[in-house]
Amino acid sequence: MKKYNAILIGNGTMGKRHRARFESCGVEFVAIYDSKECTVKSPLESLDADFVVIASPASTHYNYVKDFLNRGIPVFVEKPLATTAAEAQELVDLALSKEVPLFVAQSECFNPIFLNFRKQMVAELKMAKRDADGKINLKLEFRREHGYSERCRDVNVALDLMVHDLSMFLTMFKYENVQLENFVNSGDDESWAFLRVVSGEYAGVEACIKVNRNSNKDVRMISASFDDAEYIVSLAKYRGDGEVEHVSDSLDNEHRFFLRLLYGACKDWGRRAAQNAANAVKIAAG
């Protein structure tokens, strides 16, 4: 595979993680821009590379992504894609019109634990009982909680955390078949959303998504309840002391997938993934 050169914008927690994984795949970062560290003095707009990694604060994503797409440079950007529904869709449309790869790092969609869960759910849904109206009685609950952190305080918890769960939900059910029934923000740190699949093959499915980034718990889980069965899966691994262990495969998988996009593979899948990320923002942004 070709050796790629890249630019990194934002060398914080996620920037460092993305950089390390791309470097392990042979990528060389020719420039790093961060509020605390810059490896080059040249203006950002004068630099060229095979792609850019954007891991700066969420409120800056839209402007950075738009600039690089307009320059024809492929973009790998941390979630959320943007902070408004209109901006998120604009970026997806721009990438499509420019024929430039756009990838949003929503790593839970690449979490092998979730991928196994989704495979099981698809099989169960195919065999699920239906009521007199042909609807499926399946209730999903997504929970994502962790303690307070100074990271990602420029956006509310829905754009910070809920986009993960929304993107997973939207890989199972088509956005155009889904209706947002209720959305509640309890300050900047706690939100929940109630969604219903109102049309299509899986009409009747309901989902409640709860997120909290100022909790005394550390939870990343999905539960699924049918008429006669229940499944619960944790998306995180826990050490013996109860602390969460990061599932490294999630990040590794998404980086490998992005490099395949650069190589020209999986184009249709890549476009659907970018649209999925925009659709998650549309729901999370309210």
Regions found by a protein language model. Name each.
Residues R71-I73, K98-P101, Y202:
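A short helix->loop->beta-strand "cap" motif at the edges of active sites that frequently abuts
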Residues H18, E37-L94:
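Beta-loop-alpha module in the N-terminal Rossmann-like domain of NAD(P)-dependent dehydrogenases
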Residues M1-C38, L259:
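N-terminal Rossmann-like dinucleotide-binding module
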Residues M1-K3, L8-I9, C38-K41, F51-S56, ...:
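C-terminal helix-rich "cap/oligomerization" subdomain common to oxidoreductases
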Residues Y148-K217, Q275-A278, K282:
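Rossmann-like dinucleotide-binding domain that binds NAD(P)(H)
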Residues A82-C152:
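A contiguous active-site-proximal alpha/beta segment in oxidoreductase catalytic domains
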Residues N185-D188, Y202-R260, C266-G270:
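NAD(P)-dinucleotide binding in Rossmann-like oxidoreductases
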